[in-house]
């Protein structure tokens, strides 16, 4: 199993990894009411650690090795993205061996370059999902990539509530576009498919292809609706386009981390019924996870469990409600399992479906 996103070895440029990808560096968010993002990030355990030296409304919020960029600059690409999408994720940054070489490689393979002056950082960028941006950030083994452009106001990478790496983020795309975006990541960066899912709820369904970068640190499932009225369609209407559906961050103690962010006021999607937990050992062999703590907030469990040789393969996960427009967050702990919680997809899908039916976004007819 593995390597997992949080412990994959450092990258080098190679035939297998031609762009030299090395992981997620940041996700950028923007909102018509930026204070809502500040309040949300604080609930999830993030600290405001730096401000841009010449664009003070661009902020860095960190926890462990996870960085969220809050962009409230009125002259930015992000501001234009907000005008089109409302609360949104207008960009993500990838850590790479050499930013300029990664950019040149991507453009040579057909990527659309983005060189306007309204970028968040003065680094190479291309157009990505739904017109959002992908920034390329040099690895910077011994120093921070933010030192040149940001003024630190706190120590970087605070522990927060224990979330220490960005595990994956998921895209929602228009029906028929899943293969297009698979080819985008495959042709430009040599991503490969590691999972395929076909999920059917009571009223709606979706297909999903989970992709991983050659470095193993960037994982992006791509979701496409099975019909014309499902939850992916609902997202696309609300977001006014394709984009990031959710961001997953990892903890070494999901129970303590979840207790903390719940106490901070973060709300979670409704958990499954008690039978799910009572039957969990039938599905996840010989696990010894505390059912009472799982049920407290609705933590889900997946994986093969404890194998004959004593090896553990368990994934624990829980999901927030939608908190940035239609975007939500996932909180996970990996105990030897490198999947996406396939055994819980049905429960998650139906939980989202219930939420959208109750809000009137989709019909139960």
Descriptions of predicted regions:
Residues 1-152, 168, 175, 179, ...:
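An N-terminus-focused feature that recognizes amino-terminal "leader" regions
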Residues 37-42, 106, 184-186, 261, ...:
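Conserved active-site tyrosine of GNAT-family acetyltransferases
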Residues 56-58, 77-78, 143, 201-203, ...:
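Flexible loop/turn segments at secondary-structure boundaries
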Residues 2-11, 317, 321-365:
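TerminUS-proximal long segments
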Residues 21-32, 152-219, 228-229, 238-274, ...:
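Surface-exposed interaction/gating patches
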Residues 10-12, 226-234:
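Active-site-adjacent structural elements in folded domains
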Residues 69-71, 76, 125, 136-155, ...:
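Intrinsic, low-complexity N-terminal interaction/targeting segments
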Residues 54, 63, 215, 322-324:
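A generic beta-sheet turn/junction motif
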